[in-house]
């Protein structure tokens, strides 16, 4: 059936209008509004508002070179983390926290004394069974520190009930999350985030951005839906 001229003009007009409102996406930059072959879960369903989406775009754009370098060297460490997290029945995407913490560097040490790929503090590491002495620091052993981090993250998830709160606690401590819950009267991350330290809020968004960079939008569903 031939297309009527008025219908064609209307279709073209709508299409042109859409071009005006959809943000321009640079080649190679993630498009969080339209991802090919993945329309099942919208960003709105995952509570990722425009401000969060813009953070993800900006973060990946600013850190693309560094993220690409980590990606190139990630096969061996990610094989370890995948094995450990599968053994503990945890999402393998938790491995991207180590990207945020240290760029997967086993010898990384922070100014406050956190060390290893998971940047564990000495007291936390010892509670998790890692040995630290002048001769040996198991926080810097990828397999042992990953096992400790997995157990810690599993405990945090059991304590707070969702992953985004667990990430905030991993970064800023459980007391900061409990304070945010008390002040907001909510256990939902997106409702209480305003009461969290700015560093923890940024940390959670960095995880979302890094996870998206490595795996795409569908990988975020488990972490953001219902959080």
Please place each PLM-identified region on the residue numbering.
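An acidic, Gly/Ser/Thr/Pro-rich helix-cap/linker signature
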Residues: 2-10, 16, 20-89, 94, ...
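Catalytic and substrate-binding regions of cell-wall glycan-acting enzymes that process beta-1,4-linked
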Residues: 29-60, 109, 116-119, 123, ...
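Second-shell loop/turn segments in exported
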Residues: 63-71, 83-84, 105-114, 131-142, ...
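Solvent-exposed, polar/charged alpha-helical surfaces in well-ordered, non-transmembrane soluble domains
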Residues: 72, 76-79, 83, 95, ...
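Short, functionally critical alpha-helical segments immediately adjacent to catalytic or ligand/cofactor-binding
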Residues: 90-107, 166-171
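Substrate-binding/active-site groove segments that recognize
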Residues: 112-134, 146-149, 153
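Non-catalytic, structured segments within soluble enzyme domains
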Residues: 149, 157-175
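Surface beta-strand/loop "capping" patches
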Residues: 218-227
């Amino acid at each position: 059936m031939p297309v009527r001229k008025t219908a064609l003009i209307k279709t073209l007009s709508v299409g042109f209008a859409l071009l005006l409102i959809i943000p321009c996406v640079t080649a190679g930059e993630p498009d969080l509004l339209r991802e090919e072959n993945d329309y099942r879960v919208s960003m709105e369903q995952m509570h990722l508002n425009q401000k969060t989406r813009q953070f993800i775009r900006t973060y990946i754009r600013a850190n693309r070179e560094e993220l690409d370098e980590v990606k190139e060297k990630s096969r061996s460490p990610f094989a370890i983390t995948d094995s450990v997290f599968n053994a503990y029945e945890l999402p393998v995407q938790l491995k991207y926290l180590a990207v945020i913490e240290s760029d997967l560097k086993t010898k990384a040490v922070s100014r406050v004394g956190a060390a290893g790929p998971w940047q564990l503090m000495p007291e936390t590491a010892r509670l998790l069974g890692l040995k630290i002495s002048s001769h040996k620091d198991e926080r810097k052993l990828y397999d042992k520190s990953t096992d400790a981090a997995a157990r810690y993250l599993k405990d945090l998830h059991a304590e707070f009930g969702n992953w985004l709160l667990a990430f905030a606690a991993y970064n800023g401590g459980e007391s900061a999350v409990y304070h945010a819950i008390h002040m907001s009267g909510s256990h939902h991350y997106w409702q209480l985030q305003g009461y969290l330290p700015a560093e923890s809020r940024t940390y959670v968004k960095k995880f979302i951005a890094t996870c998206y960079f490595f795996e795409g939008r569908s990988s975020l569903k488990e972490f953001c839906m219902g959080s």
